[in-house]
Amino acid sequence: MSEAASQDVLYEVADHVATITINRPDVQNTISGPMLDALTERLLEADRDSDVRAIIITGTGRFFCAGLDLRTGNPGGGTGTERRVSVTLDLRSTPPTVLHNLDTPTICALNGSAAGYGMDLALGCDIRLMADNAKLAAAFTARGIVPESGGTWILPRLIGWSKAAELIFTGRTLLADECERLGLVSRVVPADTIGDAARALALEIAGQAPLAVQSSKRMMRMGMNETFDDHVHHVFLQLLPLFQTEDFREGMASFMQKRKAEFKGR
């Protein structure tokens, strides 16, 4: 990761919560080629860190992310529009694909508006909290392209085919209250409390048994594409190793003793 990219994608871990911050407020937090690699590295780093139990993704300033920064040219070197677009497209899918496959729960704190790739990045997170002054826009068809980063897969599953088609085909901008009504975000909070709200939720998740939370996420992901009978079978297979963990014993003991559990993640 380059020094510039590390400044554009900030990373910190505290109290079992990793926070990844897109930090280019002067260009509406648009994402450059090197930042795509940095985002991927940070997401994988957090997921592999046994101390991290929840991940927050947010932005600095008035925007969460206004999309990709195509003005920076070809991140892979060389010249020519076709080569530049080809390399950019190769890089675009990486962070959303990583997000989709992470076991660690992810929270998007939409501190500001998200458009295009920024919207897809937000949709890739498990939970979305949204500032009351933020907006969402697909904004792909107006640029002559498609939502290449998972939006066409996620949106119909979140809000149904008809509404997803309307949003993708028109690129219409949504205000925060409509995003909440449609189920695109879990809740809308005052803009000046978005960071605190996301952290409070992350800490609440981090207080649960981490192996159980991760297994629950895997089961939810698998359940999107399998029958009920297959899913129940896979849930049973997840339960067997959980019964052998220290956290299971601690969870049972804390319940019987009417005290707060102290989970170790093992």
Labelled PLM ranges:
Residues 1-7, 253-266:
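Terminal low-complexity tails and localization/encapsulation signals of metabolic enzymes
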Residues 25, 129-134, 185-246, 262-266:
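C-terminal long alpha-helix characteristic of the crotonase
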Residues 94-103, 108-109, 115-169, 182, ...:
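CoA-thioester-processing core
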Residues 172-178:
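Acidic, divalent-metal-coordinating active-site segment for phosphoryl/phosphodiester hydrolysis
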